[in-house]
Structure formats: C-alpha cells, structure tokens
C-alpha cells in the first residue's frame, strides 16, 4: 500500500511540475511571440477593446464575413473565399473580440451585444451598407439578429452550414468540457497539439501558417470564446427563426460531419427552416462542417450565381 501511495504521489508530482513548466514556458513564449504577430487590416476601438477589420477588394457590393466559433484567425481561415470573392466584391472580415488580431474581452457575449460591436466596428471603419452577410455555423445567430435589428442594411444572407436556432435546442450542454478546454489553453497545452488540430486551411503558405499558429496559441480558448459558447443556447432563443421575405437567402448545408448530429438530423434542421420560406434556397453538399475548406470552388460558384440572380 505504501509503495502504491508513493507511486501515486510521484506521478501526481510529475504531472503538476509538467503543467507548471508548460504554463511558465507558455507565458514567456506569448510575450516573445507578440512581436512576431503582423496584424492584417485595421483596428478600431469598440467597448474598450480593439476590433480588427480586414478589407479586400473594392467592388460595388459589400460582403461581410462572420466566422463560426473557435476560429483563431478568421482572416486566414477564410483566405480562399475572400480572395476569390474580392475580384468582384468588397469583402470585409470582422474578427469578433477574442478572435484573430482583435483584443479579448470579458464583456457579455449576448448575441445583441456581439452584433452591436460588429456594427460599431464597421461604422468606425467607415464601411456602410447595404451588406451581404456571409457567415458560418454559430454566426447564423448574429446574422439573424442583424436581419431583425437592421433590416434595411441586409441585402442578402449566405449561410455556410449554419447552426440554426432549432439545433441548439437539441445540442448537449457540456460546461465541464468547455471549462477544461479553457484552462488547457491558458496553461499552454495547445502547443503540444499538431497544427492540423487548429489550422484547417491547408492552402496557406508557411508564413501564414506561422501567423495562424501564433494566433491559436494566443486566442484559443479566449475569454470571449468561452463566454459565447456558454451563452449560445440562450442566444439561440433570442433570434428569429425565419428571414424577412424581402431578403434572399442561400444556405449551403454539410453532411453533418464535424457537428454532433447525424447527416439526417443536421440537414433536417435546414429543411424545416426553409420549408415555408420561398426566399430561402438550400443546397446540400457532401462535405464536413467546415465545407469551405473542402469544396471551395463549388461554394464560390454557388455564391456568385446566387448574387447575380438576386
């Protein structure tokens, strides 16, 4: 029994020392890495923190891109999409608080608060509507809230595998896992994970991958990311579950891989959402949740066709 106790205490001591050493190394590295970060875009002050806005292209119509949850660098994550669309449109990527080159924030992540910050950031950057909102996954909630609060600003909605409000009713709430992910990130355990864990855009060049990696170490999982994940089910109850008939919408829906739902369940949410809305077009794609990394050309083609016809 004494041997087992000593063995247990030895293992526990090793784990604690390992975590402490990792944390110290992580904090020192973050300070050094700050000098290597090369912000893309411009920063504006909103609610006491800097929000980063990236603009590409100068077309007559403006597409605002909103990323899904847990994306360390929305600018680099959507690089293929923004580059392609910027040849014809003005593409604006707004990095929410706690994402990319934006500051972290402990402000409320209520969906209306997040929308307000996005709206203020665009205004301060002198970017005016009407906007075509292109959003992924959880950003569906902000998109739907935008449609309700500022209807005259929304020309069209494009959903990249939207996590629709009804899906959050069935989403299993795992606060313990979120807390574990948060503290694992703060300690610096992400540094032991392979790049493929957090860099999904495999077309990035080496310098871009380095930037993405540094942003991942800094921002995953930020306070803002944690808080928005903790409040997402409540936020889903605050947005409308339909779209103004005057606003055309295109929903591109994945096969459910990468969500916690089966293909039938995931696509059924979109089917029900669009069932009585003639202005909502649904396209089903045989690709995972981050479908813009798997069928980029097809998605760009669909978006251009949709916008040309609307």
Where are these regions (language model features)?
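Conserved HGGG/HGGXW glycine-rich cap/lid loop of the alpha/beta-hydrolase fold
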Residues: 52-101
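Conserved serine/cysteine hydrolase catalytic core
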Residues: 205-276
């Amino acid at each position: 029994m004494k041997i087992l106790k000593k063995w247990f205490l030895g293992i526990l001591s090793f784990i604690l020392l390992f975590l402490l050493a990792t944390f110290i190394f992580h904090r020192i590295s973050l300070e050094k890495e700050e000098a290597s970060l090369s912000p893309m875009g411009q920063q504006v002050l909103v609610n006491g923190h800097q929000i980063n806005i990236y603009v590409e292209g100068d077309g007559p119509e403006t597409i605002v891109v909103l990323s899904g949850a847990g994306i360390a660098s929305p600018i680099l994550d959507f690089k293929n999409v923004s580059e392609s669309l910027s040849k014809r449109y003005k593409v604006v990527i707004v990095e929410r608080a706690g994402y990319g080159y934006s500051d972290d924030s402990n402000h409320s992540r209520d969906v209306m608060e997040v929308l307000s910050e996005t709206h203020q950031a665009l205004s301060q950057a002198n970017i005016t509507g009407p906007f075509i909102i292109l959003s992924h996954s959880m950003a569906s909630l902000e998109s739907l809230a935008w449609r309700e609060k500022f209807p005259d600003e929304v020309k069209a909605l494009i959903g990249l595998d939207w996590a629709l409000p009804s899906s959050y009713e069935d989403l299993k709430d795992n606060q313990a896992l979120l807390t574990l992910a948060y503290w694992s990130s703060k300690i610096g355990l992400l540094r032991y994970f392979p790049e493929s864990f957090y860099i999904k855009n495999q077309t990035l060049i080496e310098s871009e991958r380095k930037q993405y990696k540094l942003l991942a170490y800094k921002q995953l999982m930020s306070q803002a990311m944690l808080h928005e994940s903790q409040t997402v089910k409540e936020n889903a109850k605050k947005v409308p579950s339909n779209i103004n008939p005057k606003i055309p919408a295109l929903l591109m829906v994945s096969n459910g891989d990468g969500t916690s739902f089966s293909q039938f369940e995931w696509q059924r949410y979109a089917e029900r959402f669009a069932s009585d809305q003639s202005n909502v077009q649904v396209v089903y794609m045989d690709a995972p949740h981050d479908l813009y990394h798997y069928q980029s050309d097809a998605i760009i083609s669909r978006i251009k066709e949709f916008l040309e016809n609307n």
